[in-house]
């Protein structure tokens, strides 16, 4: 008598067919109102009124930030790591780097006993 168990291999499920966007219908510009270009001004209106309000706001922000001075980000990085005199870093992942090739390392002579940082 042979044993007939359930197979562990399952056939992949059929994928549902989704129509491509061009088959559904055209995109209506009112759905994406911020991407639509503004209407051209009439002859009587000055061209300065049709400027993008975001562009005008950027100009105001630049003037306000220019008077504040340098950003304190560089200072905060120095405060987190005290200086020890030897500024050797382990590497980008915090792991130690491979030791140098012994053939390339020069032995320190008398008077040159300083650290090789």
Curated annotation (Swiss-Prot):
Tissue note:
Expressed in a variety of tumor tissues but not in normal tissues, except testis.
Q: Where is this region: Disordered?
A: 1-117
Pfam families membership: GAGE
Q: Which domain of life is it from?
A: Eukaryota
Acidic residues compositional bias, start-end: 32-45, 87-96
The cross-references to InterPro entries, in alphabetical order and at most eight, read:
GAGE, GAGE_fam
Q: Which family does it belong to?
A: Belongs to the GAGE family.
Quote the function comment for this protein.
Antigen, recognized on melanoma by autologous cytolytic T-lymphocytes.
General remark: This gene belongs to a family of genes organized in clustered repeats. They have a high degree of predicted sequence identity, but differ by scattered single nucleotide substitution. Their sequences contain either the antigenic peptide YYWPRPRRY or YRPRPRRY which is recognized by cytotoxic T-cells.
Know the name of this protein? G antigen 1
What organism does this protein naturally occur in?
Answer: Homo sapiens (Human)
Q: What high-level taxonomic lineage is stated for the organism?
A: Eukaryota, Metazoa, Chordata, Craniata, Vertebrata
Gene this protein is translated from = GAGE1
């Amino acid at each position: 008598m042979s044993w007939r168990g359930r197979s562990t291999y399952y056939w992949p499920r059929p994928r549902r067919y989704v129509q491509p966007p061009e088959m559904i219908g055209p995109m209506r510009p009112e759905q994406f109102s911020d991407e639509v270009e503004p209407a051209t001004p009439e002859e009587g209106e000055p061209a300065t009124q049709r400027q993008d309000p975001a562009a005008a706001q950027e100009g105001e922000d630049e003037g306000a930030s220019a008077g504040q001075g340098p950003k304190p980000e560089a200072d905060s990085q120095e405060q987190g790591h005290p200086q020890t005199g030897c500024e050797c870093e382990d590497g980008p992942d915090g792991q130690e780097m491979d030791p140098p090739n012994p053939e390339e390392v020069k032995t320190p002579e008398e008077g040159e006993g300083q650290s090789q940082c």
